[in-house]
């Protein structure tokens, strides 16, 4: 094994020189330089500096503007709540631990940080799945006369929390475990060892299939069908400039959605699976640290993609920030009107993500 396994930790360095110490008790500067921990803390500070305001603003603007309190926006709010879980449950903790160079909060802190970071990420992930399914049902109409109601939205919210806890809670209950990973300043699921009594192998397989592959297939299917529906509508109304513009906008939205999903989650899932499949192989502390925190940066990607592309929300957000006035009101109003015209040619609901 090209690492050192101890009680509830795995350090990616062979202890031939005797310098490896518990990441709960000693600084891990033998893994990377103190400057690397400073960079990690600075990156977490950046994510908090951007992620907290944009997600908090999402909640505040939706509460303030009644017209935004639609069933679909319940899911978008759930996405913002998930991102705030990651900000407060993961990023703030990592700033503190990176300042010390090790996971100074101990085993209990590791369990809490791992749980809340995983929970936030999974709520966000399954919220994206619910959004994709909603768009497919409303725009493509596989079920005739389907209308996304408040009850459907509530069911979607419950579903996201059930699925998120189905992934985040088992390591607290003995099926796998949370341990410090990478630079040993944040905690995640144990992909690294086959420690007796934790059944890490079965949990990692379950997590990879049910909490990565299946969501990926669903998102690709739903947005692929959505794109086909828009193309068909545009082909049937080739003389309509607004319909052609709708096709381009939705195409761009779908591309960004899929890329955002892949950029956030594929590196982390791929590296985790590689480590799991090649246990004992040599890898450095940055090998898992970089993709792990790249996935957590979805707290910034999500609101930018799913909310800031919503013209109506953008108008309300500007109005809130500018004390009740929108200096771009004419432009935003014309854009919103055009959006509604475009959307009506494809479905009785909207094509845009809200």
Swiss-Prot record:
N6-(retinylidene)lysine modified-residue sites: 296
GO CC term, one of those recorded: membrane
Bilayer disposition of the protein: Multi-pass membrane protein
Residue(s) at site: Plays an important role in the conformation switch to the active conformation: 113
Protein keywords: Cell projection, Chromophore, Disulfide bond, G-protein coupled receptor, Glycoprotein, Lipoprotein, Membrane, Palmitate, Phosphoprotein, Photoreceptor protein, Receptor, Retinal protein, Sensory transduction, Transducer, Transmembrane, Transmembrane helix, Vision
Region called Disordered, residue ranges: 333-354
Residue ranges of the TM segments: 37-61, 74-96, 111-133, 153-173, 203-224, 253-274, 287-308
Glycan-bearing residues: 2, 15
Primary subcellular site in the record, as a coarse category: membrane
Cytoplasmic compartment residues: 62-73, 134-152, 225-252, 309-354
GO biological process: absorption of visible light; G protein-coupled opsin signaling pathway; visual perception
Lipidated sites in chain (S-palmitoyl cysteine): 322-323
Placement of sequence motif 'Ionic lock' involved in activated form stabilization: 134-136
A GO MF term: G protein-coupled photoreceptor activity
Compositionally biased spans, kind Low complexity: 334-354
Disulfide bridge map: 110-187
Membrane topology, Extracellular segments: 1-36, 97-110, 174-202, 275-286
Post-translation changes: Phosphorylated on some or all of the serine and threonine residues present in the C-terminal region. Contains one covalently linked retinal chromophore.
Compartment annotation: Membrane; Cell projection, Cilium, Photoreceptor outer segment
General function of this protein: Photoreceptor required for image-forming vision at low light intensity. While most salt water fish species use retinal as chromophore, most freshwater fish use 3-dehydroretinal, or a mixture of retinal and 3-dehydroretinal. Light-induced isomerization of 11-cis to all-trans retinal triggers a conformational change that activates signaling via G-proteins. Subsequent receptor phosphorylation mediates displacement of the bound G-protein alpha subunit by arrestin and terminates signaling.
Family from the record: Belongs to the G-protein coupled receptor 1 family. Opsin subfamily.
PANTHER family associated with the record: OPSIN (PTHR24240)
Protein name from the UniProt record: Rhodopsin
Protein's organism: Gambusia affinis (Western mosquitofish)
């Amino acid at each position: 094994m090209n690492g050192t396994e101890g009680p509830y930790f795995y350090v990616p360095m062979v202890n031939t020189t005797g310098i490896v110490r518990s990441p709960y008790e000693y600084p891990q500067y033998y893994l990377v330089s103190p400057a690397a921990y400073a960079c990690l803390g600075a990156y977490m500070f950046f994510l908090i500096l951007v992620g907290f305001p944009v997600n908090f603003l999402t909640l505040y603007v939706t509460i303030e503007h009644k017209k935004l309190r639609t069933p679909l926006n319940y899911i978008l709010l759930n996405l913002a709540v998930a991102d705030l879980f990651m900000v407060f449950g993961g990023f703030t903790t990592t700033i503190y631990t990176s300042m010390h160079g090790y996971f100074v909060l101990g085993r209990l802190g590791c369990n809490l940080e791992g749980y809340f970071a995983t929970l936030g990420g999974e709520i966000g992930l399954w919220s994206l799945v619910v959004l994709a399914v909603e768009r497919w049902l409303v725009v493509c109409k596989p079920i005739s006369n389907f209308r996304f109601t408040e009850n459907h939205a509530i069911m979607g919210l419950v579903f996201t929390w059930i699925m998120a806890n189905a992934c985040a809670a088992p390591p607290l209950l003995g099926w796998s475990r949370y341990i410090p990973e990478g630079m040993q300043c944040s905690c995640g699921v144990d992909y690294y060892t086959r420690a007796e009594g934790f059944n890490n192998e079965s949990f990692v397989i379950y997590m990879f299939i049910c909490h990565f592959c299946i969501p990926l297939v669903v998102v690709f299917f739903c947005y692929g069908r959505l794109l086909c529906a828009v193309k068909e509508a545009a082909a049937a109304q080739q003389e309509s400039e607004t319909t052609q513009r709708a096709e381009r906008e939705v195409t761009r939205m779908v591309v960004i959605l899929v890329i955002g999903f892949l950029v956030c989650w594929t590196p982390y899932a791929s590296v985790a699976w590689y480590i799991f499949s090649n246990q004992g192989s040599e890898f450095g502390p940055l090998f898992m640290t970089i993709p792990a925190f790249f996935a957590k940066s979805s707290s910034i990607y999500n609101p930018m993609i799913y909310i800031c592309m919503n013209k109506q929300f953008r108008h309300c957000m500007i109005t809130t920030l500018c004390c009740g006035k929108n200096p771009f009101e004419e432009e935003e109003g014309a854009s919103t009107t055009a959006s509604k015209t475009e959307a009506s040619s494809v479905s009785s609901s909207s094509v845009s993500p809200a």
